[in-house]
Amino acid sequence: MLKENLSFIGVCALVFAALLGLAYLFERTVCHDLQRRSRSRNISYVAMFSALGGVLMLLEIPLFFAPGFYKMDLSELPVLMSAFYLGPVAGVITELLKVLLKLLLKGTSTAFVGDFANFVVGCTFVLPAAVIYHHHKTRRTAIVGMAVGTLCMTVFGSLFNALYLIPKFAELFHLPIDQIVAMGTAVNKGITSVPTLVLFAVVPVSYTHLRAHETCADLV
């Protein structure tokens, strides 16, 4: 069990480093419009957006079409605002701090798998949206960025769930994958396998996610 947990922590650290490096690369090569602000002001903004995201992450919304371990929240809204206002690097850091704050306030009910998924999948939404928005700052590019981010989140999130998160969840909880699929079947008879679990539970969340965050375009 200890070996499994250490391996999972190592994967989390590597993924964070990779996403942070990718965000830095985008910021240096694409986002030339970023205003120079004092480090203390940037830290203040990141702290504010992270705190708001952490609180919103506590307000989880159950999904009638998915098993209980899939929930939705509006915590990506302040993360997206952070990335739009401060850049992709700030977005990734805000995403991480938001999840850590939620863990401090509430802990985890998914052996950290759900929290890791929230961070990674959130970054696949925020990074493309921020890069496109900073290429040309308009309401239209904000909407296009969120649409592209949602597409990236849907494709990556589906593959990530099917190939890593669901098997890892089963491994850490010592559950057969068939039992996890059965949780989905109890909610939706169309869920009979991991691919259909992803199709009917993960993909609809992405569309709902986009609709819920469209208001961010009116704030930029």
Outline where the language-model segments fall:
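Conserved small/polar residues in nucleotide/adenosyl-binding loops
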Residues: 208-215
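Alpha-helix-centered segments that form part of catalytic cores
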Residues: 188-206
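Feature marks short, highly hydrophobic, charge-poor N-terminal signal-anchor/signal peptide-like helices
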Residues: 2-8
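Interfacial aromatic-anchored transmembrane helix boundaries in multi-pass membrane proteins
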Residues: 3, 57-74, 96-132, 144, ...
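Juxtamembrane non-transmembrane "cap" segments at the membrane-aqueous interface
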Residues: 160-187
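Short helix-perturbing small/polar motifs within transmembrane alpha-helices
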Residues: 19-36, 45-55, 115-165
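Hydrophobic transmembrane alpha-helices
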Residues: 11-82, 89-90
